[in-house]
Swiss-Prot record:
Keywords noted in UniProt: Nucleus, SH3-binding
Protein's UniProt keywords contain Transcription: no
A Pfam family of this chain: SH3BGR
Gene that encodes the chain: SH3BGRL2
UniProt xrefs under InterPro entries: Glut_rich_SH3-bd (IPR006993), SH3BGR (IPR051033), Thioredoxin-like_sf (IPR036249)
Superkingdom in the source lineage: Eukaryota
Name this polypeptide is given: SH3 domain-binding glutamic acid-rich-like protein 2
Similarity annotation: Belongs to the SH3BGR family.
GO molecular function, one term: SH3 domain binding
GO cellular component terms, A-Z: cytoplasm; nucleus
Taxon lineage: Eukaryota, Metazoa, Chordata, Craniata, Vertebrata
CDD domains, sorted: GRX_SH3BGR
Keyword Nucleus: yes
SUPFAM superfamilies: Thioredoxin-like
Length: 107
């Protein structure tokens, strides 16, 4: 399974862009393989994201906003959930990945 981060490359909202960048930078820094899925370039991907975000995570009005994070077809969460997992040091669990153990250097 690959981590998929649904983003909007042409979002006019600075807050959304910053959240997307935060997720992508974290994954890159931790060498977690992921795929960016730009919902502004594919109506099919946008509809897939809207359909697969659980009802309890959908806003009362409108559609879910990026970034939305999936592990394959399994929904992981939105930015707020990602941020909470980052703060509590549980990102690997949030993403449905096995935690990596830091390797000790041999003396």
């Amino acid at each position: 399974m690959v981590i998929r981060v649904f983003i909007a490359s042409s979002s006019g909202f600075v807050a959304i862009k910053k959240k997307q960048q935060d997720v992508v930078r974290f994954l890159e820094a931790n060498k977690i393989e992921f795929e960016e899925v730009d919902i502004t370039m594919s109506e099919e991907q946008r509809q897939w994201m809207y359909k697969n975000v659980p009802l309890e995570k959908k806003p009362t009005q409108g559609n879910p906003l990026p970034p939305q994070i999936f592990n394959g077809d399994r929904y992981c969460g939105d930015y707020d959930s990602f941020f909470e997992s980052k703060e509590s040091n549980t990102v690997f669990s949030f993403l449905g990945l096995k935690p990596r153990l830091a390797s000790k250097a041999e003396p």
